[in-house]
A protein has these predicted regions:
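Short conserved segment of the HATPase_c
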Residues: 91-103
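Short helix-loop "hinge" at the ATP-lid/N-box region of the Bergerat-fold HATPase_c
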Residues: 59-60
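Short alpha-helical Gxxx[C/S/T] motif in the catalytic ATP-binding
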Residues: 118, 122
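Conserved catalytic submotifs in the C-terminal HATPase_c
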Residues: 3-7, 25, 30-40
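A conserved beta-strand-to-alpha-helix junction within the catalytic ATP-binding
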Residues: 3-18, 32, 74
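Short beta-strand/loop element within the Bergerat-fold HATPase_c
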Residues: 66-78
């Protein structure tokens, strides 16, 4: 059950980041974060952190050694956008809707561990808080996932 309350998005993001730092370092992936420390929004910190972790974990998994992952937070009028951008393998346009289905995995990624529920779960968590997730991606160019959370 989700419990939204006013809390620091910086803290929520830091929680998610702490779970991927080691894996990113091991692959020599440069990770940058740009998030205002004083940004307070109404969200379920525990579950939002889980959703962010799922995006970050995928970014680490599918970004080759020496790649880059950047996380930025932008406050719009109605939403706060948490954007996770990577220099990974990318996702073809024809697969971009399917990646949010439960147990969906692309053909080419079976060497990676996973059961295909990370993005499904992330979308459920965000949707139940009145937000949405969008993706922009191109094979060979990486991916950009944005979690949009309502400011109210």
């Amino acid at each position: 059950r989700l419990e939204k309350k006013d809390s620091s998005l910086f803290h929520t993001l830091a929680q998610a980041m702490s779970s991927i730092v080691y894996a990113a370092e091991k692959k020599e992936i440069a990770v940058s974060v740009d998030c205002p420390e004083n940004l307070i929004i109404s969200h379920d910190s525990k579950w939002t952190s889980e959703a962010l972790f799922n995006l970050l974990d995928n970014a680490v998994k599918y970004t080759p050694s020496g790649g880059k992952i950047s996380v930025s937070v932008v406050q719009w009028e109605m939403y706060v956008e948490v954007k996770v951008t990577d220099t990974g393998k990318g996702i073809s346009e024809s697969n971009q809707a399917a990646i949010f289905r439960r147990f969906y995995r692309e053909e080419e990624v079976h060497e990676q561990q996973g059961v295909g529920i990370g993005l499904y779960l992330a979308r459920e968590i965000v949707t139940r808080q009145g937000g949405y997730i969008k993706v922009i991606s191109e094979p060979g160019k990486g991916s950009e996932f944005s979690i949009m959370l309502p400011t109210k």
